[in-house]
Each structure stands twice: as C-alpha cells, then as structure tokens.
Amino acid sequence: MDKKKLLYEFEKELEKKGISRRDALKAMGIATASTALLNPIETKASEAKASDVKAKIVIVGGGLAGISTAARLINSLSNPDVTVIEPSDVSVSYQPGNTFIGVGIYEKKDVMYELKDFLPKGVKLIKDKAVEFDPNNNNLTISSGERITYDYLVVAAGVALDFGRIKGLEELGNTYTMDEKSKIKELFDGTGVSTVYNTDAAVYTWKNMQATIEEAKKGKKLNAIFSHPDTAIKCGGAPKKIMYLMDARLNEVGKDVRANVNMTFYPNSMKMFSVKEYEDVIKEQYKQRNMNWKFAHNLKEVDIKNKVATFEHYWDEKGAWDPDLEEYDLLRRTKLVDVPYDFLHLTPPMKAPDEIGNSPIGSGRGWVPVNKETLQHVIYDNIFSLGDIAAVPLGKTGGSVRKQYKVVVDNIISAMEGKELTAKYDGYTVCPIITGIGSVMLAEFDWSMKPTPSFPLDPTKERYIWWLLKAYILKPMTQYGMLSGKV
C-alpha cells in the first residue's frame, strides 16, 4: 500500500468518527509525519531489486506479526513460497482497540477484521493449528495430522491468556484475545469482573464500568481494583490505561461521583514502569488523580459470588549474616490478602501456547528463545520468532512488531543467500499510555531503557495530538500499512 492510499484510509477513519475539521487537519498532519518518520526505509525497500533466492517459508501465526512478515516476504522475493498456518478467521483484528471498547469509545465491530481480507496475494493459508514441532527434521504437524515441511520457520503465534492459573476462573483455561468461544460471557457479564485482554470481555468491561458508575451516582462507596500479574504480558501499559480511563469516565459524571470510588492498582512488580522517566510521571499523575497503588501483589483467586479478590503479597526481610558473602541474607515472606471489590479489572497471566512452549523450539519459560537482535532461534538457525511469543526483554507490543518483522525478513533473505545476518532489532517499543479521554503520553524506549521519541517533543508530557494519533491514526496505519508489509 502506497502512502496516498494509507492517507486515504486515515481520512476515512476520521470521517467515520465525525471529528471536527480542525482536529481532522491536526490528525492528518500527524498521519503525514508518521508515514515519513516511522517508515523511513519504505522508499528504499520498494526500489530495491527483489531477491531471486527460493526457499519454503512457513509462518506459524496469522496475526499482526505473522501477516506483516508474510507480506514483506512477498514484496521482497521474486519467487516467494510462503505459507501461513492460522486457525482463526479474525486473527488480524485490531487488538489495541480493546481498551477503547472497555470504556465505550469503540464497539466490538470497530476492531474486528477478517483474515481473508488481509492475506497477502501469493501466500498460502492453512486454516489449522500447529501442534507438534520436529526442528531437527524441519517439519511440524498440524491438528489434522498432516505434516508440513519447511526450509525456514517463523514463529509468530502470540500468547495464551492463562486464566486457569487464577482460582475461581479455572473453567476459562487458556484463551486468546479474539477467542469468541470461551465462557467469558457467563463469568464476566454483570459480575464486576472485567478485562480488556479478550474482545468479548472488553464489551462486558464497559457494561460493568457503567453499572459501577450508576451505583456511585447513588452515593454508594465503592472499590475498583486493577491487577497486573507475575508473568510477562503484551501491552504492559493496558492495566494502567483502563484505570486512567475509568477515572475519566467517573469524572465526566461528576467529581462527587468519582469521590465515591476508591481506585487501587495491584501490580506484582515493584515498579509502575520499567523506564524511570515514565515511571516518575505516572506516579505523579496517579497522585493528582487520587489513584492508589500497592506494589508486590499477585492475583491468585477471584471469588465471583462474594466479590473478593485474593492477592499474594510478598516482601523481603533481613535474615542471618553470611560471612562468605559478607552480607545479610534476604528472606522472602508472603501472605494472602483479601480485597473486596465492586469492579475488578484483571490482567490474566500470559504464556506461550503449550504446543509451542513445551516443544523443542520453546524454552523453560515457554517463550521461543531467540537472539534479541537478529531474532534467530538460539539453537535452530533456520527458525526465527517475533511478536508476543519471542523471548526478548522488550517487545510485546504492536510498535515492536513494526520494527521486528523487517529484521526477520531481512535476516531470512540473508540466510537464504548465505550471507551474514546484519539486520538488528534495537529493542524499540512504544506504549501510548492513555491518561484520559483526550490525552496520551507516547512512551517510546529501547534496550537503553531511556526515552527514544520519534518526534521532537518531550515524551513524558500528556498531549492531545497523541490522542489523535492513538484514536484515529494507529488503527489504519496498522491494518493497512503494517499488514501490507509497508509500514
């Protein structure tokens, strides 16, 4: 997709949302700058001669990471042989939009997209699931029993939402963001339990939030709590975004209504954010909004009937003196803490799908182990991985995928040509932290764990222009730019 077509999609999105001409002009200015600044190699790539090397490339996973990779391979090879294995019809749906569904800005239909409409021309689709891997013989098996061979394998299967680890939610087991067959409706609808990590659950998040607001309007004192688990998660800012947005929705109704709801964030970690500059600002924003936090709390159980969440709280105590190390031992202590709630937004533990995590291409922690720069498997040279499932220190965001898929494609072609893998992923990731309705802090950073803004503006400031970017520009850029392998 060329830039003119991409800008056309931006215009359609703005018209559909009915924003003012002034804001539309601002947004289009951001869109134009974004296509230039965020995609500096497009022109160079489009002018480069396609490689004549040939190999059978199989991609496991047909979401954003998998389809973007497939599209760029098609664009970069003169004789492409690319197969995508994906069981879902809606794998390319716009997952970042779930947060907006959870606060009534989007409807479910605004984020749902059919894979058939975005499958790159020339890519073969196997509508099934990879269940066994034999990397020593360059093949895998799908659930039908068919064995698929490959010369190169790309693993982009995303993450499973491990609700089953939370007592009280065992019947949900492992589910996925776009899974429409789970039992979430029965468990979440009208119970006060919510999450934006599943699209159907995001719908009930808004219903539960509205019910909480109605009760607060009656003068009732209520408790809203928000969890963050002890595993790596995709979009690490989402648990805070939904909290900011609930605060905004309550304040829309009235400051007195907001005052009736005590809001507390319970993360397992001891930090708000991994980059100090952003963490300092987030803490200050929480204080200004009268939003609380309690570190070192991991959600273990949800009693839906009695509306009680049980957390495991941990802390360290000084133990005995170690004469060899010349320091005191640290003793980890834990206790269970029951927290009553009226509204609970839970972020489920996440893991690699079992069929990958427990396979020879997985690792002790489940994620696919790769060199963090080349994204090549640490054991099998003809396997690459990217996106949420890759074991890299950062990178479980769509913004990371935008950088990673180009690295994977360039390095696969280099490997096919017998050349050194020179493309490097620098750890770039971005989290548009929605701090209110109309304000976003665009948190960009990389391996350095320092802010790395793409635009010459202070990245720690909340800005309306980043709201325009998040609300109106990023979705068409993702759906029509990245999925075509051009952005």
Feature roles, as predicted:
Residues 1-20:
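N-terminal secretory signal peptides
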Residues 38-78:
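C-terminal segment of N-terminal export signals and the immediately downstream linker at the start
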Residues 170-218, 328, 337-401:
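FAD-site-proximal beta/loop scaffold in flavoenzymes
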Residues 53, 442-487:
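C-terminal auxiliary extensions adjacent to catalytic cores
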Residues 79, 120-132, 247-365:
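A Rossmann-like FAD-binding core segment of flavoenzymes
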Residues 14-31, 38-54, 126-241, 245-254, ...:
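FAD-binding core/adjacent interface of flavoenzyme oxidoreductases
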Residues 77-150, 276-292:
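N-terminal Rossmann-like dinucleotide/flavin-binding domain of flavoprotein oxidoreductases
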Residues 389-425:
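A conserved FAD-binding loop/helix module that cradles the flavin
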